[in-house]
Amino acid sequence: VIIDAPPAHRTARLGTVLCWLAVTPTALWAAARLLGLDRGPLVQALAFTPYVAGVSVLILALALALRRWWPAALAALTAVALLGTVAPRALANTQPTAAGPTVRLLTANLLAGAGDARTLVELVRRHQVDVLTVQEFTPDAQATLDQLGLDTLLPHRQLNPEIGTAGSGLYSRWPITDVGVRRNLEGWGFSQAYATVSVPGGPPVRVESAHPSAPYALDQVGAWRADLTAQPPATPDGGLRILAGDFNATLDHSPLRALLGTGYVDAADATGQGLTGTWGPYDGDLIPPVTIDHILVDHRIAVRSVQV
C-alpha cells in the first residue's frame, strides 16, 4: 500500500499549485480592468494596474520555467491584456496638425495651502507658463503667491480660495471671460474654477481646474464616480476645452476613460509620459506612485511636451 506520494510527484504538484495561485489573481485583475468593474475596493486597487502588468510578466516567466503549460497559457493571456492597456501610455501618439500659438499650462494641487508657493511661482517664471490651475487653494496660499509675484506674471484670474481642501483657482497671462466656479455636489464638495482664455492668435479655450472627490474610503466611491461623471464633456463640434487638475483617477478607471471618450486626449498619454506618477509616496508610506493628475485637452489640440 502506498501511503505517500513520491518526492518528485509532490514537488511537481507543488509547482502546479504555485503557478495557479500566482496566475489566478492577476487574471481576475485583468478581467476587472477590461470589463470596467471598478466598484468598491477595486477602485483603489485598479490604480496600481501598471505595477500588476509588470508582475504578470514575471508570473508568465515562472510558469514557463516550471513548464506548467496551462497556467502559462492563462498567464500569457493575462500579460497581453494588461500590457495592452498599459504599455501604449509610454509611447507618443501622432499629433494633429496645428499651426496655432503655443500655450504653456501648469496644474498643481496645493495640499490645502501647504504646497511650496515659492517653487510654484518659480516654475511659472522659468517655464513662462501662460495658464495655471490650482486645487486645494486657500486664502493664505493666494496671499503668499501674490507676494511672490504671481499677480504680475499671471494678472488675470478666477479664484475661489477656501480654508481646507475645497478651494480652486485659475490664473492666466491673457484676458479671460465667462468666468465662474462650479461645485462638485458629492464627497468633499471640491470647487472648480473655470474661464475662457483669450489666446492671442488662436481661438478661445475654455479651461477648468478639475478636482473630483477622492475614493479614499468605500463609502466615498459613489461620490467619486458621481463627480467624475459630472465633469464637463469635450465639445468636438464646438469650442476648445481643457480640464486640468487632480482627477483622483487613473486611466485604468472607467469613469475617466468615459470622459476621454467624449473627445478629450490625456496630454501625458499622448506624449508617452502616461506612466509617470503624480501622487505618492508621502510621509514614508509604501504606496508606489500613481497617475491621478491629468491635463485633458480637446483632441484637436496638439500636445508637444509634458513634464511632471
Where are these regions (language model features)?
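Soluble catalytic domains of enzymes that build or remodel membrane lipids, polysaccharides, and related
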Residues: 105, 111-125, 134-308
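Residue-level marker of positions within ordered structural domains that often coincide
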Residues: 1-2, 36, 50, 176, ...
